[in-house]
Amino acid sequence: MASPLTDRQWLLFLTLLPDVGRKTLRHVLERQQVRRETPAEILRLPDETLREEYRLPPRALRALREERAARLEETARLDAHLTRCGVRWLSFQDAAYPAALEAMPEPPAVLFLYGNHALLDGLTVALLGSHAISAEGLQELEQLAESLMAQGLTLLVSATQPAYQRALLCAVRHGAPYVLALDRGLLRAFGDDLRKEPFKQARVWQAEFDPAHALAISPFRPRDGWLASSGKYRDTLIGYLAGAVIVVEARPDGYIVQLCRELLQHGRTVYVMTQRLDRLPGNRQILEAGATPFTPQA
């Protein structure tokens, strides 16, 4: 990569450095803005400045010094491939970055978007259910999803976890647009050609993901796989990104309860289904935290 790095390439280059996570990447970009340094100027800085001012960890510093040429080439290849496939990535400093995410306890420093970006501008809703959601809960969720889609709302879904999967199937089956939040990188979810439908059961209705009709969003590096912490972070991202959250079935004292309390403290819109309140203490906890009761129309 002989020519100067563009802002887009620089962001990708930093994202791929070892041990550069959300907090470090955010700090690097903020310091760069304050110091008004170009990528080329930063790469010429001594290790001491990169360590103290930019807080780059040891492995990242070593990669800059010993693997720079290879990493610049890797960045160029990945930039060309993702761009050719229609992937867009943006930092928290980008005007198109969803402002709602800045309220997250640890917001993504970078987001990778693949598909119809305009879906984020419309009315979005997330239907939440615990990992152990009951068959009755899934049936209620499906009925609610169909009703909301009929009203023109866009579902926020995921390809893993039963409640999200059921909502995803509803959207695909009805040909409705949806926003797919991932718990791994885009290339890991869709394959290198970014065509594979990541949820096997959805392939009955669509063999390949349709970027014209849906939007996939990932806060993870393109080739990152699933980690134990990825699911909770994905849930948090969905909760903050959604225009409204409707809790179908929550486990008492579980993560959904914790997330909804957090959302309510930030003044976000949280509804909780109440028709089985006597059997769902988790839903009751969310209601007691200040959520709005929600009973689907017959």
Where are these regions (language model features)?
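Short, positively charged patches
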Residues: 1-138
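Glycine-biased, small-residue-rich flexible motifs in mid-sequence functional cores and linkers
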Residues: 2-7, 92-298
